[in-house]
């Protein structure tokens, strides 16, 4: 028996008991206060993926057109990569190389150690703006921090609001915390998700109208002594009736929501990431936090967590030019980038405006190195593919951006063939580059010991239980509403006549793009019956969905849980398996806050495919 830790991009960061005596099997660690002995629905695919015959076992070298390969040895593949790195550095400098990485593997060594190598050669740096950064930046401007409350304190709340998050699918342990408390549960979400069905009250604003919803709540609260003086008289015009016309939420429900926020204190708000991927998404998060401040609930939000981990030690200090993640295609078009080194990410699946991204990589003949477990869409575009290790095949630590526990991940089996962990790959690359600095060759155990010592974690206890509690580092909340009024006044709802708003949330089966090749994803277009009737469409019709970014064909699913005026296509499906995914349609426009993603501000036309 050993302890594993889920390194996927998920709030829960579960502690796992793993056995490999009679075949690989996993179960939730019953001692862990959050995991509490059970794992999410997606966890069963971890074993299937690790043992899959589809896994890459030998490095691949491109031959001719992209997608054509021959197998080579790891030694040869790394020689090709190092030769290309040296050629580019000599020709135009390290900044012509861009590591493209994100949260496909969040384990601390796997995530940060490769940065030591890239910082050593002075590459460009990818700005992580795809997920939650807009909301995080907005919270920092208003409160001085994006670090919220300990989720275990949800048990102390009289009311819990899940705003723009579907924890029944994406934070199952947090959902159970809420459901086993005595709190009244509100869900704010345009879609009637499984979370909304399980809540006491579901508020369903049109996408992108969270700001007028909050302003109308403040309008109601102004009658009960809650003074929003920092934003002037804006709230006066946002009566529930006025806001109802914008949001689609009945005025009476807005009033009830406002009074519950007033009377059911203490309350907590779990601020989700999906709804802030709108053009004004960061401002929406900031407006919610402002409302909470006025009600004396400043710190009672869940958004992010920090624990004093020395990230500079883990990854070094980046000094290269910043390249935005969301509109990578346009960044590649205007910057001299000659190599993309991809790990912990599948950008030719997960980034918006896929048609342009693929076109520019092809047109500029950008050299691509991809380190992954499978021959996914990004790997199919690569010049060199290096097989990666699963998290059962290396030692690491996993922290959480939700709770206050760090977990050990112990190696339980060897990688297949020449598959290699992130740590070991970059040690070999450093050696082949001729580097001598100790930090480039530091071992996994040495790094683990240093991190644990810094956190005052007893190593023996960690290895005995699989996890340890660590201190949340939050700092003092410093309220600063400067400029908020002007920001709110700049808001106007987005509409496009004749178009539906496209939402691309996470589905029940996947984490990002992981698992579509193992289980298969939902690739239907989900539409409200009313919109289908207006467009003369029926369930099961083959439809064309199009906008200025692309055109795709799929089948329609009539779904009353979808908000009128919107269409849902779940993200993460593999274009190499289905011929397309939702990011062939999504906008790569960015927000004001941290150039954050705005994919949920995409609009599309939907038409029935006509028989020829």
Give the location of each predicted region.
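Active-site phosphate/pyrophosphate-binding segments
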Residues: 217, 228-328, 469
